Amino acid sequence: MQSQVRQNFHSDCEAAINRMVNMEMYASYVYLSMSYYFDRDDVALHHVAKFFKEQSHEEREHAEKFLKYQNKRGGRVVLQDIKKPERDEWGNTLEATQAALQLEKTVNQALLDLHKLASDKVDAHLCDFLESEYLEEQVKAMKQLGDYITNLKRLGVPQNGMGEYLFDKHTLGESS
């Protein structure tokens, strides 16, 4: 049945939003995997684990925001299978943070592609939604991860295990 509230909401945008929901859920799943990897007794970087768990929750919230938006515009939610993360072992904090930055760049590009699609379909509402709810936050997340990578390298990670411990305790421990 067709929605009675649907207006100027192209089916291509609707389908792309469903794909974004899947991508955000995948990102949440990856961060959850990272979180519980760093929480293991043989890794034991609890602030790193907490940071990645918070990222997982944030990505899930992003997915839910898209789901709510889809309904608000009269679109139909079509959920897809969520792919398993590429890895189960995340190595050291530097490796995981580099993987997280790559993930955020992938999500950011998908958001930019969705914004272009919305712009091409003259969907000002979707453009505004993306600009106000997602794009700035993505840039901030990428900057934060980039800063963390710089500081981890400065501390000598991965060669220096003490550097990883200090990053966990002082950088992420302070933000708790």
Curated annotation (Swiss-Prot):
One of its GO terms (cellular component) is cytoplasm. The keyword ATP-binding does not apply. It is found in: Cytoplasm. The keyword Calcium does not apply. Fe cation 2 binds at E59, E104, Q138. It comes from the Eukaryota. One of its GO terms (biological process) is intracellular iron ion homeostasis. Residues 7-156 form the Ferritin-like diiron domain. It is an enzyme of class 1 (oxidoreductase). PROSITE patterns: FERRITIN_1, FERRITIN_2, FERRITIN_LIKE. Keywords: Cytoplasm, Iron, Iron storage, Metal-binding, Oxidoreductase. SUPFAM superfamilies: Ferritin-like (SSF47240). Its main location: cytoplasm. Its EC number is 1.16.3.1. It catalyses: 4 Fe(2+) + O2 + 4 H(+) = 4 Fe(3+) + 2 H2O. InterPro entries: Ferritin, Ferritin-like, Ferritin-like_diiron, Ferritin-like_SF, Ferritin_CS, Ferritin_DPS_dom. One of its GO terms (molecular function) is ferric iron binding. PANTHER family: FERRITIN (PTHR11431:SF54). Oligomer of 24 subunits. There are two types of subunits: L (light) chain and H (heavy) chain. The functional molecule is roughly spherical and contains a central cavity into which the insoluble mineral iron core is deposited. Belongs to the ferritin family. There are three types of ferritin subunits in amphibia: L, M and H chains. M and H chains are fast mineralizing; the L chain is very slow mineralizing. This is Ferritin heavy chain A. It comes from Xenopus laevis.
